Design a protein with these regions (language model features):
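Membrane-proximal basic amphipathic "stem/tether" segments
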Residues: 1-70
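S-adenosylmethionine/decaboxylated-SAM
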Residues: 48, 57-72, 83, 91-254
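N-terminal pre-P-loop "Q-motif" helix
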Residues: 77-78
Length: 254
């Protein structure tokens, strides 16, 4: 009992240290400091070590492979959240979707565990749409219109070509949503960075989530994304659960 208790205390300390490290690292990285990049690499190594406490080596290896194959700006724990939540939701009815695919890193993690479900992927494949005054990091502007344009529909299709039931759509969401307007979803992943894009996704997908369906977002620490979730969830009284790193989940409960 003492051994288990001691191990749990050790893990709790590691988790709290990691949360603080993530927050400070992001502030430094967004400031484009050399020290920030150093801290980012250090944090990545720390998180892989933390994940190895309870997870199969093949999961850790998969995340490492994805980070080598494509530009994938997720910390390891954030990548694991995408993988593990998608895996859990694959046992429920409903399809899966992602808006904000970029080069396909998180889509590959979802594809690995979707259990034959359809995965619908949406992106402009031309970078971010118009950035507004709400789209700040810690109160200062950072994103630029057209950022993350280093991708293409063809590259993502080729990257995910070994997986079945993958459907890709090019254009600004929800303008491209017509093919899925009558579908239901068990899992939706958002990585759209901006306030208006987040609102558009929530308004489209939340009514189409099954009972128990989960929407997971990246960049919840940014002002625009967090404000979008707060505004959308307030009147509907939807609980928001912030995860380690920059993620948040909401669940459809009827």
């Amino acid at each position: 009992m003492c051994k288990i208790f001691g191990h749990n205390i050790k893990l709790t300390i590691l988790l709290k240290a990691n949360r603080s490290m993530v927050d400070n690292t992001r502030k430094l990285v967004y400031g484009s400091s050399i020290f920030g990049k150093f801290m980012s690499n250090l944090n990545t190594k720390f998180q892989f070590r933390l994940l190895s406490f309870y997870n199969d080596k093949k999961i850790i290896d998969l995340i490492k492979i994805v980070k080598k194959e494509v530009d994938f700006a997720f910390f390891p724990i954030e990548a694991y959240h995408v993988y593990s939540i998608a895996k859990s939701q694959s046992k429920l009815d409903g399809d899966m979707a992602e808006v904000g695919v970029y080069q396909g890193g998180s889509a590959k993690l979802i594809a690995e565990v979707k259990n034959g479900k359809e995965l619908h992927l949406f992106d402009t494949f031309e970078g971010l749409p118009k950035v507004s005054e709400r789209d700040t990091h810690f109160g200062t502007s950072y994103w630029k219109t057209g950022e993350f344009s280093n991708t293409s529909l063809e590259k993502v299709k080729n990257y995910l070509s070994n997986y079945k039931n993958i459907f890709c759509y090019k254009g600004k969401f929800p303008d491209t949503s017509e093919p899925i307007k009558n579908k239901k979803f068990s899992f939706v992943h958002l990585d759209v960075d901006l306030f208006q894009s987040t609102i558009d996704c929530l308004e489209f997908f939340y009514p189409r989530m099954i009972n128990g369906g989960v929407i997971l977002t990246h960049d919840y620490h940014t002002d625009g994304v967090k404000q979008a979730f707060n505004e959308f969830c307030k009147d509907k009284k939807i609980p928001q659960i912030q995860l380690l790193g920059s993620q948040c989940i909401i669940t459809k409960l009827e």
